[in-house]
Regions:
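Long, contiguous N-terminal structural blocks used for assembly/anchoring
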Residues: 2-90
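Amphipathic protein-protein interaction modules
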Residues: 74-141
Length: 148
């Protein structure tokens, strides 16, 4: 399992982590969702400098994600997986890579489903991921991570 996914599984003592643990216990934080969250923290910056700052993963973890944002991330991942179950299965990507690609594709990064060499399946997954709209993370005044 990638190190970033393992990092997200570590236990922390706060409300967001408590929610994450509860969701995982209910089977909602699967490898797709954990990889999606890991990718979000990896490729979103904290805006701590004029040039964008550091990737969130350097100073923040799933424990810092506001509960409402974490719920939305989980719901988005669950809905995407349900709506695209056949395509995801046909892609052969595996849950972790697919979760990673879902974040990248929906946010129009330079990589994603379309460059996985899976032909029409990649194109269709790209279309559905893009139709979910972008989700940008930011640090609130309370030092929690929020999504817009």
């Amino acid at each position: 399992m990638p190190e970033a996914v393992q990092e997200l599984r570590r236990t922390h003592e706060d409300e967001a982590q408590g929610l994450a643990v509860a969701l995982e216990a209910m089977g909602k934080l699967d490898d797709f969702t954990l990889a999606y969250i890991a990718c979000a923290l990896w490729c979103s910056n904290d805006d701590s400098t004029p040039s964008g700052g550091d990737p969130l993963e350097r100073k923040y973890s799933i424990a810092d994600i506001a509960p409402e944002t974490l719920r939305k991330m989980v719901n988005d991942c669950t809905a995407f997986q349900r709506a695209n179950e056949a395509l995801l299965g046909a892609s052969g990507l595996g849950a972790e890579l697919a979760g990673h690609d879902f974040w990248l594709t929906r946010n129009r990064h330079g990589s994603g489903f379309w460059d996985e060499d899976i032909g029409d399946v990649g194109r269709k997954l790209s279309e559905t991921a893009s139709s979910c709209g972008e989700c940008n993370l930011y640090i609130g005044d309370d030092r929690r991570i929020y999504g817009i």
